[in-house]
Every structure is written in C-alpha cells, then in structure tokens.
Amino acid sequence: MGKRLAMIVTLLVLALLAAPGAKAEGVKRALVMGFDTFQSQPSTTPSSANNVTLMANALSGGSMNLYQLVTHLDDLATTEAFAQAVQEAFDGATDEDINYFYISTHGVWQEGMSNGALQLLLSDGTNEGSITAWEMRRIFDAVPGTKVLLIDACRSGAMLGKGVHGPLENVFQGDDYKVLCSSGGAEESWFWAGETGDGLRSGAGYFSGALVNGITPRGSYGADVNDDGEITLHEMINYLLENHGASTPQVYPEEDDFVLFTYDADSFTGRRREAAMEGISFDSVVLTGDSPRLDFHFTMLRPVQVIYQLVYFGPNGWQFETSQFIYDNAERYGIYGDQPGVLSPGVKERSLSLNELDSDDYGYVLVQILTREQDKLTVQTSRVICVPPSTGDPLMEALVPASFSPETGQELTLVVHHQYPCELTIWVDDAEGNTVRRLTSRRATRPQQLRPLGTTISWNGKLRDGSMAPEGTYRFRIRANIGSEVYELISPTFTLLSPQG
C-alpha cells in the first residue's frame, strides 16, 4: 500500500488578533508536498520525504508566524486531487495574504514542447499522474494574494522560459507570483540518497538543502546578506547561485525585493550556533588549466567530519557516479584520534588540486563541502569551478527575442552560445550606443546543459538606478575573457515596448 499522509497544522492563531486600531497584516499559509514513488521514473526515496520535513520546519520557523501549514507526501495522483489540496490549504486567503507552495518531484519537459506543457509528476504510492505548468497557473490563479512557488524538479525553469534556448513565455508572469525553480529548463535537479550506519535510508535534494541553509539557523541564515532579519527574493537567488552548483536556480521576478522569509535577527547570536561550519570563502571560482589549484577557507564551530566531494562535468552532465570523496585529514592524528576528517573549531585554510577535466586543460568541476555529524550528512556549500582554456575563440552567438514589455511583467532572456568555459561581461546599450545597464562583470560561466553550449541571462528592463528603461531599441554587448584573450560580440537589436506598444 502506498504512503498516505496529509497533515494540517494551525500555528499561532493568536497572531491574527490585531490590537484595536492596529493595521492588519496579511496572513501567511503554506502547502508543502513531495513525491518519492513513481511508475515511470526512478524512486527518490527518501529524498522528497526529507525535503518535505526540512521545508515544513523552515517555513514554520523564524518569525514567519504561519497561520496554517499543510503537508502532503505520496498521497496525490490526479490534477483534481492537487487542485483540492491547494483549495483546502489556502481556503480563506485574501488579497493581502502570502501563500507559500513547495513541491519536490520529477519534472518532465524537453526542447520542442511548449513550456506550459511541462509536467510535475504526482503519485499516491500506487498510481501516478501529473500536473502541467498551465494547470498549476489556472489553479493558483483562483487563490487570492501573493503566491510564492518553490519548485524542486528537473527542468522546472522551463515554466519561466529560463535556462532554455527560447524564446518561451513565462507561465507565471504577473505581479502576484514569486517563483524559485531549482534548475533551468535543460537541466536535471539532483538529489542524494544513502544509508546511515544503522542501515536507515537518508537523502535530500541539493537545491532544497541549500534553500533551507539560507533561511534557517542550520546555515546561519546565510541568505540574509545584510543581517536585517528579512530575506528577499533577490537575496535568496544570489545565495542559491553561490551555494548550489548542481543545477542553475531560476527566479521570477529578477532583482525583486519581496520579503520571502523573516526571523528575529536580534535574538540570533553567536552564543549557540546550529551550524557546524560558517564563513566558507573561495579565493576564486575561476582557475587555469595549467595550475588548477583551489584555495579556500572556512570556520569550524564544533568538531565534525569534513569531506570534500569533486564532481567533474562530462558530455552527459555532472558525473556523480564517478565523483571523488576526500576526507580532510589535516588533523587526523590530533585530539580526535584517527577518525578521518574530524576538524577542531577554528579558522581553516585549505587547497585542493583538480584533475580529470573534460579536455586537456578546461572544463567545470563541482566542489561540495560536506559535514558528517552523528551519521547525518549535510551539504554546507556547492560551488561550480570554471576552468577556461588557456587560449581559444569561444565562437559566441547571441539569441534574443524581437521585443518585450517589462511594465507588464515580461523579462527578456538572452542566450549566449560559447564553446568553452569563460568569464562573461554583458552590457545593455541603447540605439545610440550608450550603455544603460551592466548585467554581469566577468561572471564565471556554469554548465546549463544547453545544446549548443551556452549561458542564459534575463533582463527586467530596469536601469542602473532601478527605474524602467524608456521605450526604444536596445542591444546587448557581450565580452568573453579566456585567459589573457578577450572576445566581443554585439547581439541583434530588440525593442522595449510600453504596455500599449
């Protein structure tokens, strides 16, 4: 018999009782669901189950003050059951409310399909079904308020028209949607699974683990860059892009200051940390093929095992099946005896040498720093290391849509094909050749599984000062740095339209 679990938790109902004359604030509700058992795809047990637990705890923590939290695990197999779960979880919502939705499952989509046809698989443990991005939009459109969608599934970025060759529509375009996807439309979204010392199954999604690290004490609220107790959508995507390397997270809207998560920053002190490690910093994520040595440092807060995982990128993607695991044995014969990888508290400086690149002198390497404590494995960070060749024309090509209208919520996605790993700088120039915005500055590329190889980046139509660019004709100016060589490309022009344009 398949697993069936539906739990409803009502939290802090008293928070809804405003003092006389006080301004009423929006109510927060959350629906968290995961699926591990499938007919057409491999089982992910127990990763989605653990993702559900992690996300439920994260969303009900801090100072979120959720009114209601509903979780589902392997107990929905039809679009109708999904719609009913959404209706029940967000029943009573108003236009002022914030509605959180998280899902962990398999995503099914491929180039040539409409991105609205992307499927997220559903299951009740025995029967399997699916829901398309279009159907999700229709169901959530009936929910008043702001909808925050957190999607951990392969190719999920396709629903935003991101991480694909495009141009494709954004299924969730609109002021009332805030969306984070674990991967671009051409990418897998990875999870890990294993066994503990006592034979129990363990595992979780890499994206979900990074997301939880960013918004909980487990990761010292790492996404809150300015330590103000508010983690915005913009802060969250920046944190994920830096600390989650197995896929390329996608966001809508870009550069949005909507507050996703809150916590009491004043009460979070250094006296008692849940995190085992903090302050992870890499000297550079761009290395040279003739000397691929990675230097980094971090601070241990308590003694735990530290393990480095190196995953090389090959023709078919990340080669997790042949990844290297390296215990940090610098202190093996210290006060912790001969237990491999245990480090004492304090600042640590380390170096790793990389090899097995996909060519003689260039490629991508995923470096993950893991800690093991009481047989519990945690991914502390996951960084993509870019190793460009020492020389070589990347043969760049730029693809852009003909037009977009940012004041209606549209964003324009640029696709840059480049044959080699490199550092990209991208400017937006107007028709007179004046630069109105710089989108990136020597940003290291990362594999997005595009064919031909390449990078996607989106522009929301805003200028340096945050105001909207005027209607008119624009183009991208693109520079690729490979070693000491510089290559430049001007994209085709595109038109920024007014809402009536």
Please identify what each model-predicted range represents:
Residues 102, 307-311, 425-429:
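Beta-strand signatures of extracellular beta-sandwich domains
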Residues 294-300, 412-418, 459:
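Aromatic/hydrophobic beta-strand junction motif of beta-rich domains
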Residues 348, 362-368, 472-478:
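A short tyrosine-centered beta-strand micro-motif
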Residues 8-17:
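Bacterial N-terminal signal peptides
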Residues 369-415, 475-501:
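C-terminal tail/sorting-segment detector
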Residues 114-116, 129, 199, 223-233, ...:
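Acidic, glycine-anchored loop motifs typical of Ca2+
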Residues 321-358, 435-469:
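Glycine-centered tight-turn motifs at strand-turn-strand junctions
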Residues 24-284, 295-297, 302:
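Cysteine endopeptidase catalytic domains of the caspase/legumain-like
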